[in-house]
């Protein structure tokens, strides 16, 4: 009886662990978010082009809203530039071919030679394309 109880306890523990593990789709989205973050930090324009959907709507915490072309142009020209940039406390929710991502945007932004600490919240919408690639279709930042 002790062995049966031990086996059942182990199975319950393991099944809880498996349920808590991220899915492969969540891992793909997390990787896409990381690639976007690194592309923004390092001004990797081809990577930004590859990750942003043509119909992207990119909202800033200031209320400014950009399309794909304007978002990438600001990174390319240095209007949006970063000394450091990372996403923290990320939560990914999947719904069919859409991923909703909430995270904390933590950066040392560069305004000319001035370093500006930036701590805002982000809400991103990613969509899985027919080719299996995840593209950013929407982003809204807000102050907390």
Task: Please name every model-derived segment.
Residues 119-144:
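Short beta-strand edge/turn micro-motifs at domain boundaries
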Residues 1-4:
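Positively charged n-region of N-terminal signal peptides that target proteins for export
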Residues 36, 47-48, 56, 71, ...:
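Hydrophobic pocket/interface hotspot
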Residues 52, 62, 86, 91, ...:
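A mature extracytoplasmic/lumenal domain signature
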């Amino acid at each position: 009886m002790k062995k049966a109880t031990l086996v059942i306890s182990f199975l319950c523990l393991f099944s809880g662990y498996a349920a808590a593990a991220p899915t492969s789709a969540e891992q793909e989205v997390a990787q896409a978010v990381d690639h976007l973050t690194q592309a923004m930090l390092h001004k990797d324009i081809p990577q930004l082009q590859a990750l942003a959907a043509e119909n992207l709507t990119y909202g800033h915490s200031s209320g400014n809203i950009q399309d794909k072309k304007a978002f990438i142009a600001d990174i390319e020209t240095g209007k949006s530039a970063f000394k450091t940039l990372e996403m923290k406390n990320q939560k990914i929710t999947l719904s069919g071919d859409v991923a909703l991502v909430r995270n904390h945007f933590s950066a040392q932004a560069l305004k000319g030679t001035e370093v500006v600490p930036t701590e805002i919240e982000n809400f991103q919408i990613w969509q899985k394309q027919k080719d299996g690639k995840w593209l950013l279709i929407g982003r809204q930042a807000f102050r907390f």
